């Protein structure tokens, strides 16, 4: 369905791999329009956003200043959405700034702390504005997480392995943390100790979350984004795995989030909340 007035979209982290995919997806969507592209990389300043992603000229130059973009977007008649794929060090302030200007954030950047998430939830509720924080925009990953929740009814032992490219700044991944949280929300105690473990190298057994589920993080060139959830029981191993071969797989989830976030009045975490 094509809206009479397309929703304006700001892309932050526009020169990154995900940012470029978002620009292409937004430009190709009839009900959306690229409003601005923001990135701190000095090599792309003043470059046209279309040229950046291999499309025709869009007459939208990349800028490194988010605040003036948000201020201008606040004057638009149509609600504006900001899609953020930046860095854990800047995403929190980006969200607060967007909400302050009445721009709806869709966040793909991971690394927000629990304290920051609680603060942002309170901030969005006071503003009665929607904000989506999505650790993984892949429909396939949501299905994996749902399958893991079902499997947890029958297995008491589970560990998670997440594998990403070596330019990912945070570990463990937000997707792995989210998966562990979904399993922990069931109120089950996982991985009862059978022996007293001793690590000869710190961290050899991975990170241990409050759900008592260990998460192992791997960072290598050649990887994009992959996750395994391994359930073990006497005589059997049940493995769930999701592999990303192209970042285009995230775009249906990104576009859905852009279209849904303006209908919300508080922060929501996870793609499954809007499916």
Swiss-Prot record:
Keyword check for DNA damage: no
Pfam family, one: DapB_C
E.C. no: 1.17.1.8
CDD domains recorded: DHDPR_N
Binding site for NAD(+): 13-18, 108-110
GO CC annotation terms, alphabetical: cytosol
Parts forming coiled coils: none
Active site, per annotation: 164, 168
Subcellular location: Cytoplasm
InterPro entries attached to this UniProt entry: DapB_C (IPR022663), DapB_N (IPR000846), DapB_N_CS (IPR022664), DHDPR_bac (IPR023940), NAD(P)-bd_dom_sf (IPR036291)
Transmembrane feature ranges: none
Record: residues binding (S)-2,3,4,5-tetrahydrodipicolinate: 165, 174-175
Pathway stated in the Swiss-Prot or TrEMBL entry: Amino-acid biosynthesis; L-lysine biosynthesis via DAP pathway; (S)-tetrahydrodipicolinate from L-aspartate: step 4/4
Keyword Transmembrane belongs to the record: no
Biological process terms in GO annotation: diaminopimelate biosynthetic process; lysine biosynthetic process via diaminopimelate
MF GO annotations: 4-hydroxy-tetrahydrodipicolinate reductase; NAD binding; NADP binding; oxidoreductase activity, acting on CH or CH2 groups, NAD or NADP as acceptor
Reactions performed catalytically: (S)-2,3,4,5-tetrahydrodipicolinate + NAD(+) + H2O = (2S,4S)-4-hydroxy-2,3,4,5-tetrahydrodipicolinate + NADH + H(+); (S)-2,3,4,5-tetrahydrodipicolinate + NADP(+) + H2O = (2S,4S)-4-hydroxy-2,3,4,5-tetrahydrodipicolinate + NADPH + H(+)
Keywords: Amino-acid biosynthesis, Cytoplasm, Diaminopimelate biosynthesis, Lysine biosynthesis, NAD, NADP, Oxidoreductase
SUPFAM superfamilies: Glyceraldehyde-3-phosphate dehydrogenase-like, C-terminal domain (SSF55347), NAD(P)-binding Rossmann-fold domains (SSF51735)
Annotated NCBIfam families: dapB (TIGR00036)
Its job: Catalyzes the conversion of 4-hydroxy-tetrahydrodipicolinate (HTPA) to tetrahydrodipicolinate.
Family: Belongs to the DapB family.
Protein name: 4-hydroxy-tetrahydrodipicolinate reductase
């Amino acid at each position: 369905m094509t809206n009479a007035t397309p929703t304006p979209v700001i892309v932050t982290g526009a020169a990154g791999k995900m940012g470029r995919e978002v620009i292409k997806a937004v430009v190709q969507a009839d009900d959306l329009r690229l409003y601005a592209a923001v990135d701190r990389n000095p090599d792309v300043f003043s470059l046209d956003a279309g040229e950046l992603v291999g499309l025709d000229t869009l007459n939208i130059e990349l800028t490194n200043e988010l605040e003036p973009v948000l201020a201008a977007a606040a004057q638009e008649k149509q609600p504006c959405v900001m899609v953020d794929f930046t860095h854990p060090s800047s995403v929190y302030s980006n969200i607060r700034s967007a909400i302050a200007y009445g721009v709806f954030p869709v966040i793909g950047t991971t690394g927000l702390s629990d304290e920051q998430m609680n603060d942002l939830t309170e901030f969005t509720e006071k503003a009665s504005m929607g904000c989506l924080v999505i650790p993984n925009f892949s429909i396939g990953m949501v299905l994996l997480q749902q399958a893991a929740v079902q499997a947890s009814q029958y297995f008491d032992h589970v560990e998670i392995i997440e594998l990403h490219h070596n330019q990912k700044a945070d570990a463990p991944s937000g997707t792995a943390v989210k998966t562990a949280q979904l399993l922990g929300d069931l109120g089950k105690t996982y991985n009862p100790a059978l022996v007293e473990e001793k690590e000869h190298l710190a961290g050899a057994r991975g990170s241990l979350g409050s759900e008592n589920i260990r998460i192992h993080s791997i960072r290598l060139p050649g990887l994009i984004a992959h996750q395994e959830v391994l359930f073990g029981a006497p005589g059997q191993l049940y493995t769930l795995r999701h592999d990303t071969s192209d970042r285009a797989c995230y775009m249906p989830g990104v576009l859905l989030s852009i279209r849904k976030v303006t209908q919300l009045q508080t922060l929501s975490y996870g793609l499954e909340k809007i499916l």
